[in-house]
Amino acid sequence: MQNRGFTYGDALFDVLKFEAGNVTFLDDHYIRLMSSMRMLRMKIPSHFTLEGYEKELMKTLEANGLKDSARLRVSVFRTGGGHYLPESNQSEYLVDAEKIPDAADSPYEIELFKDYHVSSGLLSTVKTNNRMVNILGSIFAQENDFQNAILINERKELVGATDSNLFLIKQNRIITPSLDSGCINGIVRRKVLEHLRKSEGRVVEETAVSPFELLKVDEVFLTNSILGIQSVDRYRKKNFTDSVAREVRLELGM
């Protein structure tokens, strides 16, 4: 097998949302994908322009008969063989599309996943195919009747949920794990931060966050490209409000 995405996890991916005839935040996703490929020393094909990228996404949606909302996944992998040292840095890609299932209407409860940790540092901000901690955290959440699990790094700092970035609200303070924690450099995370920084009277902090903060804050919400903004209802015995999440969701049209 010559696909290095299978043999070494030598691949990255992105997830995009198609809705109302458009791919949400397409430009931002494209720029992040190009940046991630450069970071992983993958050569970018000359035809991989923004226009060409959008055309491939739309072609995949059409081939799958998806005209309403859909989840798109773009997988990019290094081509050729080799072992840890690749024979080539050329890259190829695959595009998958599927219908977005209806959201569950049950209370959204989270719990810490402490069996394994995410590595801090900038490499973890890239969506590589090495997602084993996220997978095990998702299994843990399902087996224990939680809607999601919160991951930590080797410094025992909060990183994010298994599939999303994490925001905590305490009065006028907006707190989210910094990129150095190992959280994904999320597109919706960035949009939310941009919006909240324009709000008067609020202090926005990208910083190291202790798990103990989850029991001290007023509100918790998660962000990703498919969910948009997901309010968290409960963590252990702590119930949360959702006023900031509702405000940002309205302002960003999510």
Could you say what each language-model-derived stretch is?
Residues 64-76:
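Ordered, amphipathic secondary-structure segments that act as subunit-interaction surfaces
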